[in-house]
Amino acid sequence: MAVAPPLPPAPARLLRRWQGSSPWLSSSFGRTRYFSRPAFAAGGRQDYSPSSGMGVSKTGAFRLGLHGNLNVQSSVQEWVDETKRLFFLRTTNNVRNNITNGTTPLRVGNLRHDPSEDIRSSNYPSLYNQRERGPSNSIVNRHVDTDLAKHRVMYQSAHAVPAPFSVANNDIKPLNLLDGSKEEIPWHDSVTVESSLPKVSKSETTLVVDKAIPNKKEHKRITRKVTLNIPDKASLSTESKNARKLLATIYDKVLVVDNVESARSVVKLLTTKYKGFIHACDTEVANIDVKEETPVGHGEVICFSIYSGNSDGEADFGNGKTCIWVDVLDGGRDVLMEFAPFFEDPSIKKVWHNYSFDSHVIENCGIKVAGFHADTMHLARLWDSSRRADGGYSLEGLTNDHRIMNAVLKDIHKTGKVSMKTIFGRKNVRKNGSEGKTISIEPVKKLQREDRELWICYSSLDSMSTLKLYESLKNKLEAKEWIFDGCPRGTMYDFYEEYWRPFGALLVKMETEGMFVDRAYLSEIEKTAVVERKLAADKFRKWASKHCPDAKYMNVNSDNQIRQLFFGGIKNRNKPGETWPQSKAFKVPNDESIATEGKKIPKSRTIKLFTIVEDLKLFTTEGKKTTKTGWLKVRGDVLWSLAGKIPTDHIYKIDDDGQEFDEDGSSVELPEQDIEDTSPYGTAYEAFGGGKKGREACHAIAALCEVFSIDKLISGFIVPLQGDHISCKEGRIHCSLNINTETGRLSARTPSLQNQPALEKDRYKIRQAFVAAPGNTLIVADYGQLELRILAHLTNCKSMLEAFKAGGDFHSRTAMNMYQHVRDAVEEKKVLLEWHPQPGQDKPPVPLLKDAFGAERRKAKMLNFSIAYGKTAVGLSQDWNVEVREARDTLKLWHRDRKEISAWQKKQKALAFEKCEVYTLLGRSRQFPNMTHAGPGQKSHVERAAINAPVQGSAADVAMCAMLEIERNARLKELGWRLLLQVHDEVILEGPTESAEEAKAIVVECMSKPFYGTNILKVDLAVDAKYAKSWYAAK
């Protein structure tokens, strides 16, 4: 039995749509269908047929048959789409390409361009369900597992073609399959004719040719392996079909602009007749990863839409066209530039959903966007700052939420935004033909070119939905009272116009400015970080291998392997009956190239790790975080609790034998101490027996913690800051600044500059990489204890107001008021609250309070900040590692002289439960869910948030007002200074070096009096400012 090699790859499909209308095309497709058959490709090879199975008659004519149960809709477009999909079922076509009727080459017909001919003539393919064929015909049958799916495709003959290619090779020769030949191909159940097949995947199947032998009553069966092309895209879901049908209803409302002449006509209307309207704008952009890349300098606008309206209704651009859709793909740059007068006119009011993104991508094309009127994302956050469900703040989520849209005008289109995933997404198909879970979407350029009408509707709906959303949110905010620091001030839409509208424009301006980054410096500290990480990892492995030999080869980034070393035998929190094993085997990379003699070196090897701690009771897991699967998390606090508070420099000074390195790298034996101070060490000290072994364990585990810390700095800051995806050609990074926190604080992403490591943890001085351009300087200005000052103002706390008025070390004063023995020491002048050295003085005459009573001051400091965050005695006990009773007693000491704060906290909790919202200084609100049926955990969370939100939110209000004050300052503009970044309570500006001193004084003045040149708070706003070439030096 001969087995032929796989079939050659099939040529790309071609499809020619029928132009014009024909009576016979409008008839029902229940019995007969018609389609155009493209001409053959050059070189004599015939093109693919829209077939799922073939039959060849004695006359050489093909006929297409459909399964009796196939759902056939009487729609031309439906049939055309189905025909397209059938083109991709290529296996049977490969068979058909190689079938001849006896020794006669295959004949295939082309559809004539004259549809007036009788449809029964041989020039038109007919489509019908072939149940049976005579024995004289050569049939191609496709099996669906055991059932024969009678999907047959046959064509009428019109023009002869060259002999087809052989199955075995590309030679032009007939296969000479005679009458009665039969070919069978197994097929998968889930692969339907209706599948959409823009791509195909391959799987191997068996082709069986049952060949009749002339003049004999026997057949010769030939079996060969062939490649079966299986679709990798499933059919549209019912949801997608319904959404498409609804979406198509807006097409008649859209005016398509795709040339310069029509663009000029539209722009003339926009800038004259409809200039006073509100214009909602939206862009569609290709060549950008919105999750990773900044839109500044990235992305390509392929189309945009504009939808205009006012209180009287929609703009009309002729023939009922109310929305403009502009095609700028494939050479449409000139069309886009015609809209520059519209976009750049500051008097034309424009509304956006995510103004930042759209404005940047338009400005990439050389158009400076002006006339910002509203960002519906900001309006939605002002209305409800705590949306987490129902799509959050996406355009789809907002416009399909009746609670948001119930204030919209009735005459505006009612269709809410529909996601691209719903309209264009299709599930992939697995290799076995079954439907997968992953949904993929074609590139937007392809969608715009090939699904043009649907794409026009989809992208136009964005601007239509944006205007509708703006109208509804504006109505809602106008109905909500604005309370400014306890006094009525107007409506919340008035607040938006006065503060958040200019603030939104300022944030976009700051994003455009960006900040210069020294990549050469980042590259150098990356090398240092990699070396130090290796040293720390090797230190830990060396120590661990003393207790477990295979730990020498372990992956220090594997939580499971670390858990195995320290926590074998712990119980699963989700499944109490399940425990982590005492020993376990792991696969690790074979970096040492270990191999069995005579065999190849494997890429991986197996190691065995076992638990190295005997007394697990010393490792308390109570109150520790667990993974989703119920196992103890082994990062962060858990490992540091084992190591203790060991300075990081000790990790590189103490080796595994308890020795300290000299300057030259040699080591000397540490002297034994009569009384060892064990306070810096964690629970691992006792667990490993104390003394030398205990110290070794703590230092080794601290080294492991350093591995994680260094990894975080490398992956989170050092490497990303060097990427092109967040920077432009000038070397400046452009992060995205967003008002998207529940309290109103800014967040920054791509990159997340808000999460820069604290100075004491910034071991590689990452801020040193943020520098001013040549000839410029950075000013870094920071509020001092802003949230505590806000708390003092909101609560009118006499003790705190007096402490801030007196000045000095606030936390030392708090400790003095909390602890009588500290107060006695201050009054007896044994310690000083603070000390300001005079010329010639090197040290204070007596110790400072922060040095003599460090523990008390640390507790006071933590309490000062914890109270503002609503932390309870339970939380404090965990922070201090003490009993809850002790933490509660300390908390009472703090509240003893601050009764106003206790009363204010009760009031905030009551507001959260009664009105389901609390308010900031400027009157913004944070909403909470109804607590009537909430559990204890949820109630506790809301109580803490009710205390924290007004404080943090008011601090955000102050920072915003300060930035607006700086932006409005004419002198700073004249000197050439501009805002670059805001990180929490800190702002950064850049400008000419020669005017740095004057500019710094102006910035301090603006920040200390941020409310139009005044300070409405009961306490002064302390501002510390410096200028230098880098962010680090100016801190």
From Swiss-Prot:
Keywords: DNA damage, DNA repair, DNA replication, DNA-binding, DNA-directed DNA polymerase, Exonuclease, Hydrolase, Mitochondrion, Nuclease, Nucleotidyltransferase, Transferase, Transit peptide
Biased composition (Basic and acidic residues): 111-120
Protein name per Swiss-Prot or TrEMBL: DNA polymerase I B, mitochondrial
Transit peptide: 1-42
Source taxon at top rank: Eukaryota
PANTHER family per UniProt: DNA POLYMERASE I, DNA POLYMERASE NU
Location of region: Polymerase: 699-1032
Family: Belongs to the DNA polymerase type-A family.
Cited SUPFAM superfamilies: DNA/RNA polymerases, Ribonuclease H-like
The protein's Enzyme Commission number: 2.7.7.7
Main location: mitochondrion
Reactions accelerated catalytically: DNA(n) + a 2'-deoxyribonucleoside 5'-triphosphate = DNA(n+1) + diphosphate
Known regulation of activity: Not inhibited by aphidicolin.
GO aspect biological process, one term: DNA-templated DNA replication
Annotated spans, Disordered: 100-124
Domain 3'-5' exonuclease: 317-478
Role according to the record: In addition to polymerase activity, this DNA polymerase exhibits 5'-3' exonuclease activity. May be required for DNA replication and accumulation in mitochondria.
Cellular compartment(s): Mitochondrion
GO cellular component: mitochondrion
Matches recorded under InterPro entries: 3'-5'_exonuclease_dom, DNA-dir_DNA_pol_A_palm_dom, DNA/RNA_pol_sf, DNA_polymerase_A, RNaseH-like_sf, RNaseH_sf
Broad enzyme group: transferase
Alphabetized GO MF terms: 3'-5' exonuclease activity; DNA binding; DNA-directed DNA polymerase activity
Species name: Oryza sativa subsp. japonica
